[in-house]
Amino acid sequence: MKILVVLTYYYPHWTGLTAYARRLSEGLARRGHQVTVLTAQYWKTLPAEEVHNGVRIVRLPTIMRLSRGVIMPGFPAAANRLIREHDVVQVHVPIFESPLVTALAKRYGKKVVITHHGDLVMPSRPFDQFVQFFVTGLMRRALSQSARITIHTRDYAECSPFLSQFSDKLVQILPPVEIPLPQPERVKAWRQELGLDGVNVVGFAGRFVEEKGFDYLLKAVPLVLEQLPNTRFVYAGEVNVVYEPFFERWRHLQERWKEQVLMLGLLNDQQQVANFYALCDVLALPSRTDCFPMVQVESMLCGTPTVATDIPGLRVPVKLTGMGRLVKPMDEQALAEGLVDVLRNRSQYLRPREDIARLFDLETTIDGYERLFQSLV
């Protein structure tokens, strides 16, 4: 098959969404399919076209950033050409151009599969709320014209008023999770380097944005320390998020607890990410809203249980595996109690890597998409 994949950001950009798209695209390419990715040239130093791990990447110049997206003047012409050349189209939303893609595909008799990565939930500022309203409208139009909509979990979809409008099109395919085995000797050395020998380590990872709820974790720090003074919190991720300066609102808490809260920055190397998970005794996911953060399953595969808020989508890995605790969302007291429980009773929450890998198998995910695409060609 010739498969066209459309999304705003692709390799070497790294978020959960781009990791999803890259793992799936490269997996399909390994099986002999011709996969082309149409995406933004968000850095001018990136080549306009290249082949990476068997996937052809076509990058379009951008003229400006708009909230979380970018404006690509050359998109209509490029999409028009590439859609005609391919058998089926996959669009990862949100992306401004999604209704244009579905309209062009309809013109040429090509089917579109839209992969939904969560309802768009923006901060309460007026401009952000306008973007949320506008982009959700674009998504609604695109989803109405699509052949199928892939979702991460039924749990999230059943609680989403937006997705309930398209229940007859929904197909659940668990996300493609892939993480190398941790390196015990390097993990041990890293712990020593960071001064973490003999202490409890609470990890948290991802973009420091409002939806991730890391402000509640910072509020929970003194509550955890009251019961377990020998605890440190270690963050891996990006705090300088261009479209949402949320960290600045809570920097004072990080600085207040700077001896207990270590900031590692963004980790781009997947082996280093695996070692980070193994460095931690528990991973905290205090999200306000989250469709399905793959970091949770990656952490479990590296032997680290999680404490996550009991919200649609996010709660699924803990419910399926038992490898962690669910706590009330937006409640630092509940979060602290969950973290203390897992730290004190960690052995009760451990599960064999093989059990986690059977539930979240990369090849099974690729199988699901391969069958879906073939059914539409």
Predicted feature locations:
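Nucleotide-activated donor-binding/catalytic signature segment of Leloir-type glycosyltransferases, i.e.
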Residues: 246-267
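Conserved donor-binding/catalytic core segment of Leloir-type glycosyltransferases
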Residues: 195-212, 218-221, 234-236
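Short alpha-helical donor nucleotide-sugar binding micro-motif in glycosyltransferases
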Residues: 83, 143, 275-280
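Short hydrophobic beta-strand element within catalytic cores of glycosyltransferases
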Residues: 305-308
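Conserved acidic donor-binding segment of nucleotide-sugar-dependent glycosyltransferases
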Residues: 320-321, 325-332, 341-346
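Donor nucleotide-sugar binding/catalytic pocket of nucleotide-sugar-dependent glycosyltransferases
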Residues: 36, 132, 136-184, 196-197
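Glycosyltransferase donor-sugar binding loop
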Residues: 43, 177, 205, 232-248, ...
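Aromatic "clamp/platform" in nucleotide-sugar-dependent glycosyltransferases that forms part
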Residues: 94, 288
